[in-house]
């Protein structure tokens, strides 16, 4: 093949591109020995006066076929004409590419046999022209993008587009000058491959007549990998785990895929990947700088054109289109090309049978049930019900087995094992439920396989022999709503939908044989069981549970299930989520806590008033549950955006007298510029906690809030304003609240730049006789030692303040000395003092030790993250041994202490009768130091109950010593990070 190509190709065109001096130099090089090729030179007598035409003939004469080209290309480089070398290489590749021809034949067949367009190709190209342009532009040199992701839900056309671009490349109509080799990898076909190499994987489709496949890797920038089928991938891919750059080495399949996706293997190559909803969650984060192309489906005009092409006859197409358009939910579903095909197929067969133009479209389950009954009726009329039932059950068993085992292409053996003959397989192909895949079979679409898998549970009987590969109803419910999302999630959602009396009745009427009536009861029992186990209850994915409940459209069933749960977390990211959440939440009667994230709903930038008003309708419906549910107490919203109208609806509901809300938590919430929130706080007498952590507040917002808090009707006791961008300028407003609101007991201002100026204002209020604050959290507030004199005055004056958090402020030794002077005063009532990360040294410990001896009220002292060293710890331990010391908790985590002071710590553990908790976390103690501590812990006089220590950070022998002590002392717990959760909760970072 190579010889015929070179003889036809012709050198003359390239020689004519040489300038006079370049051509002369070219001839001079030809007269020299060609040692690299082990060829003799062409005699100078023949070359000297030879024209370009003559030289072309001489090259062909002396170096026949491919040799002439190898010599010519080598000489082009020597005369600095790399442009000609590059162009010739590219043309040679294009001509010498049997692989491209092989792919053209393969994908032409796939396009004709396996793609369900039912429309002219020019219509398809017109609907996808924007995506085509994006794909073409994505891989240009200017774009510098090597990874492109096609994103869209199932049925939107991702696979169809990938097949089309593969065919277009093979035909030379796309990326002609960009990619020499394009490989189409259907990753679900790799489920059965344990170990291979990339070279071996690609060799499966490599024509024997082509060049060595190894040669293609010399220019990886000319390679594109098209990857599809991630939804059906059986194994999980890991981020940066055991990646490899060796395309020759055999290794586990997940490593090869992970290495390609993360650009460890062939980093200069390009990727084109299709990801649906599930695969986006599992794999998108692994990609490096991907360009995202979203497939949006059909517009209204494209839907109309699709109907026209599908039905052919214009009057019939228009009649069906108008019918579907008048059916709102059904028309919305038809933006998805596959769903549109389902609808058209259902309607067409009904019309052909002379039936009414009717299709139930309450939800997706109804649509698939209608499709199944329509095609089943068309192909099974000549068989008795018993035979039809057996055949349908066998088909659904095949689908279920495939989903549970991640099998999507079925051999004749697979069919036989599930009770299907080859002729029955052909029958299902005729009904458009299966399709041919070479000598095997596959379902027409993954969604159809998922629906048929759900139908298996409606068709199976208790006496049937179990298939060990297919999970039970209980296992499917758990897989749907507890485990991470898999294909079983959608099967479970379909199972919810087909369990309803209405759908069971519809299916029985159409099929002509009875179906299980117990499915819904079994689902209910499974969910009740999950709700009663704390671990399962906390792991429930309410997003999926709500979708399943919504599919039933049975209010009584939804109410019964939702009454199993008192706490729900739900994410609302689009209008569909909002519709489903509003439907389910309004049927919750026992719900006490709702944790909710609302994104991409409000504000609405679409410009469509009707769509926006529709969102507000469903939002109002959702918020109504705060009024109707008498048990509701906690609303926790995080990472949420609300505009003024949506906030007004929420606040109106929360302000109703019948709303029993006790805690309102807004974490990182944007709520516009309306003060409705604060009015709701004022008018709800049950509300005791308000948290706005991470929510940016303007000075105006703070002033509105403070006016609310000063009102006699306000009942707020805990106020969390951490990380709210509060500066010293508004501290006067906050101070005015402290001075007059005797109900406020807890205030967190962590992570705000209050500075010393703001602290001075707060301290004046804290000294006020009406101030009843008990806990004040001021971590990361940009305070210095300057504030300590004012704080000291508060410690002397305040009779209510029991916990003061000054962590992560630069108080330094001199600042703490001022605090200690106040702490030693008998009138000081503080019980907990947090001084972590306050830039303290051992110099401060003398003053602190004196406090421990004389202040019997101080129970907790946290000094972690300070450079107090062994010297400082010794002073503290001496104080702990004093009989007047009543300290119960001491925090020293990450303090740079060594074995040298462990004897002092041990002595303190034995002598101090009140010390219950000691935190030594993140301290690099050696084995000898641990032995000393363990001996003290084992002493009968040691009263310690909690030791903060990172056990797994020690060697195996030391870990055994620590575990042995824990086992020997029942009241002792040794744990890592023992106070973190409690500290976060008190500060309001996590509630």
Swiss-Prot record:
ATP binds at residues 152-159. It holds the Pfam family NOD2_WH. Keywords: ATP-binding, Cytoplasm, Immunity, Inflammasome, Inflammatory response, Innate immunity, Leucine-rich repeat, Nucleotide-binding, Repeat. InterPro entries: DAPIN, DEATH-like_dom_sf, Leu-rich_rpt, LRR_dom_sf, NACHT_NTPase, NLRP_HD2, NLRP_innate_immun_reg, NOD1/2_WH. SUPFAM superfamilies: DEATH domain, P-loop containing nucleoside triphosphate hydrolases, RNI-like. Induction: In brain pericytes, up-regulated at the mRNA level in response to oxidative stress. Expressed in ileum intestinal epithelial cells. Not detected in peripheral blood mononuclear cells. Expressed in cerebral endothelial cells and, at much lower levels, in brain pericytes. Residues 1-94 form the Pyrin domain. It is found in: Cytoplasm; Inflammasome. Residues 146-465 form the NACHT domain. One of its GO terms (molecular function) is ATP binding. GO terms for cellular component: canonical inflammasome complex; cytoplasm. One of its GO terms (biological process) is pyroptotic inflammatory response. LRR repeats lie at residues 743-763, 772-793, 800-820, 829-850, 857-877, 886-907. PROSITE patterns: DAPIN (PS50824), NACHT (PS50837). CDD domains: Pyrin_NALPs. SMART domains: LRR_RI, PYRIN. Belongs to the NLRP family. Sensor component of NLRP9 inflammasomes. Inflammasomes are supramolecular complexes that assemble in the cytosol in response to pathogens, such as rotavirus, and play critical roles in innate immunity and inflammation. The core of NLRP9 inflammasomes consists of a signal sensor component (NLRP9), an adapter (ASC/PYCARD), which recruits an effector pro-inflammatory caspase (CASP1). Within the complex, NLRP9 and PYCARD interact via their respective DAPIN/pyrin domains. As the sensor component of the NLRP9 inflammasome, plays a crucial role in innate immunity and inflammation. In response to pathogens, including rotavirus, initiates the formation of the inflammasome polymeric complex, made of NLRP9, PYCARD and CASP1. Recruitment of proCASP1 to the inflammasome promotes its activation and CASP1-catalyzed IL1B and IL18 maturation and release in the extracellular milieu. The active cytokines stimulate inflammatory responses. Inflammasomes can also induce pyroptosis, an inflammatory form of programmed cell death. PANTHER family: NACHT, LRR AND PYD DOMAINS-CONTAINING PROTEIN 12, NACHT, LRR AND PYD DOMAINS-CONTAINING PROTEIN 9. This is NACHT, LRR and PYD domains-containing protein 9. It comes from Homo sapiens (Human).
């Amino acid at each position: 093949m190579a010889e015929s190509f070179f003889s036809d190709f012709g050198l003359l065109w390239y020689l004519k591109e040489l300038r006079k001096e370049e051509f002369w130099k070219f001839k001079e090089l030809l007269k020299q020995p060609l040692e690299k090729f082990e060829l003799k030179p062409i005699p100078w007598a023949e070359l000297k006066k030879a024209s370009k035409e003559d030289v072309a003939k001489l090259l062909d004469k002396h170096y026949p076929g491919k040799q002439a080209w190898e010599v010519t290309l080598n000489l082009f480089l020597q005369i600095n004409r790399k442009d000609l070398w590059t162009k010739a290489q590219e043309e040679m590749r294009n001509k010498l590419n049997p692989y491209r021809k092989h792919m053209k034949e393969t994908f032409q067949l796939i396009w004709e046999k396996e793609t369900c367009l039912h429309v002219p190709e020019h219509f398809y190209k017109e609907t996808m022209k924007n995506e085509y342009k994006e794909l073409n532009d994505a891989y240009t040199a200017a774009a510098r993008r090597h990874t492109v992701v096609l994103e869209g839900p199932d049925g939107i056309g991702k696979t169809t587009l990938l097949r089309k671009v593969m065919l277009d490349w093979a035909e030379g109509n796309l990326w002609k000058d960009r990619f020499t080799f394009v490989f189409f990898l259907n990753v679900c076909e790799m489920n059965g491959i344990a170990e291979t190499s990339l070279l071996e994987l690609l060799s499966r489709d490599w024509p024997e007549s082509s060049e060595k496949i190894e040669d293609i890797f010399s220019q990886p920038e000319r390679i594109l990998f098209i990857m599809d089928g991630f939804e059906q991938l059986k194994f999980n891919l890991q981020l940066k785990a055991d990646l490899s750059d060796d395309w020759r080495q055999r290794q586990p399949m997940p490593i090869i895929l992970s290495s390609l996706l993360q650009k460890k293997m062939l980093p200069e190559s390009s990727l084109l990947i299709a990801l649906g909803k599930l695969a986006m969650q599992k794999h998108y984060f692994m990609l490096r700088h991907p360009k995202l192309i979203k497939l949006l489906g059909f517009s209204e005009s494209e839907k109309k054109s699709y109907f026209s092409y599908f039905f052919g006859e214009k009057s019939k197409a228009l009649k069906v289109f108008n019918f579907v358009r008048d059916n709102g939910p059904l028309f919305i579903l038809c933006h998805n090309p596959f769903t549109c095909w389902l609808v058209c197929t259902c309607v067409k067969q009904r019309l052909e049978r002379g039936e009414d133009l009717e299709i139930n479209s309450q939800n997706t389950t109804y649509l698939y049930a209608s499709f199944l009954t329509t095609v089943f009726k068309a192909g099974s009329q000549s068989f008795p019900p018993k035979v039809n039932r057996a055949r349908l059950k066998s088909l659904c068993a095949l689908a279920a087995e495939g989903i549970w085992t991640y099998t999507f292409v079925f051999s004749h053996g697979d069919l036989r094992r599930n009770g299907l003959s080859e002729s029955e397989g052909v029958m299902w192909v005729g009904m458009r439920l299966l399709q041919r895949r070479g000598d095997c079979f596959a379902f027409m679409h993954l969604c159809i396989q998922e629906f048929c898998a759900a139908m298996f549970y409606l068709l199976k009987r208790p006496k049937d022999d179990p298939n060990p590969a297919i999970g039970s109803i209980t296992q499917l419910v758990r897989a749907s709503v507890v485990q991470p999302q898999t294909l079983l999630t959608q099967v479970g959602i379909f199972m919810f939908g087909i369990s309803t009396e209405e759908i069971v009745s519809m299916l029985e009427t159409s099929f002509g044989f009875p179906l299980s009536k117990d499915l819904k009861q079994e689902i209910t029992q499974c969910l009740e069981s999950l709700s009663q186990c704390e671990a399962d209850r906390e792991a429930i994915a309410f997003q999926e549970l709500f979708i399943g409940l919504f599919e039933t459209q049975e209010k009584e069933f939804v109410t019964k299930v939702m009454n199993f749960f008192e706490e729900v977390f739900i994410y609302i990211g689009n209008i569909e989520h909002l519709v489903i959440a509003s439907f389910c939440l309004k049927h919750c009667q026992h719900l006490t806590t709702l944790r909710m994230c609302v994104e991409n709903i409000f504000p609405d930038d679409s410009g469509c008033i009707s769509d926006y008003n529709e969102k507000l309708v469903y939002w109002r419906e959702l918020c109504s549950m705060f009024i109707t549910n008498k048990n509701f107490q906690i609303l926790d919203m995080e990472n949420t955006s609300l505009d003024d109208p949506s906030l007004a609806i929420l606040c109106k509901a929360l302000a109703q007298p019948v709303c029993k809300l006790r805690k309102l938590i807004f974490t990182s919430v944007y709520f516009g510029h309306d003060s409705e929130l604060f009015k709701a706080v004022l008018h709800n007498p049950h509300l005791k906690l308000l948290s706005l952590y991470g929510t940016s507040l303007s000075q105006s917002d703070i002033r509105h809030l403070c006016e609310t808090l000063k009102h006699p009707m306000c009942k707020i006791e805990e106020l969390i304003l951490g990380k709210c961008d509060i500066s010293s300028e508004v501290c006067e407003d906050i101070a005015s609240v402290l001075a007059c609101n005797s109900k406020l007991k807890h205030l967190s201002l962590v992570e705000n730049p209050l500075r010393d100026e703001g602290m001075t204002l707060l301290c004046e209020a804290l000294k006020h006789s009406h101030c009843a604050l008990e806990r004040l959290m001021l971590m990361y507030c940009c305070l210095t030692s300057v504030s300590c004199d004012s704080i000291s005055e508060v410690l002397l004056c305040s009779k209510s303040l029991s916990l003061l958090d000054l962590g992560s402020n630069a108080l330094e030794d001199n600042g703490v000395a001022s605090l200690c002077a106040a702490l030693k005063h008998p009138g000081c009532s503080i019980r907990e003092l947090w001084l972590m990360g306050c830039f303290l040294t051992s110099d401060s410990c003398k003053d602190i030790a004196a406090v421990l001896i004389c202040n019997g009220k101080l129970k907790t002292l946290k000094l972690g993250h300070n450079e107090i060293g062994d010297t400082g710890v010794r002073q503290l331990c001496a104080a702990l041994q004093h009989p007047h010391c009543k300290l119960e908790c001491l925090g020293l985590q990450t303090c740079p202490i060594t074995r040298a002071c462990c004897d002092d710590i041990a002595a303190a553990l034995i002598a101090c009768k009140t010390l219950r908790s000691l935190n030594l976390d993140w301290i690099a103690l050696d084995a000898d130091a641990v032995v000393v501590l363990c001996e003290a812990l084992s002493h009968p006089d040691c009263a310690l109950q909690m030791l903060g220590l990172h056990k797994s950070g020690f060697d195996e022998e030391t870990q055994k010593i620590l575990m042995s002590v824990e086992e020997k002392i029942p009241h002792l717990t040794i744990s890592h990070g023992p106070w973190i959760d409690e500290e976060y909760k008190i500060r309001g970072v996590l509630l």
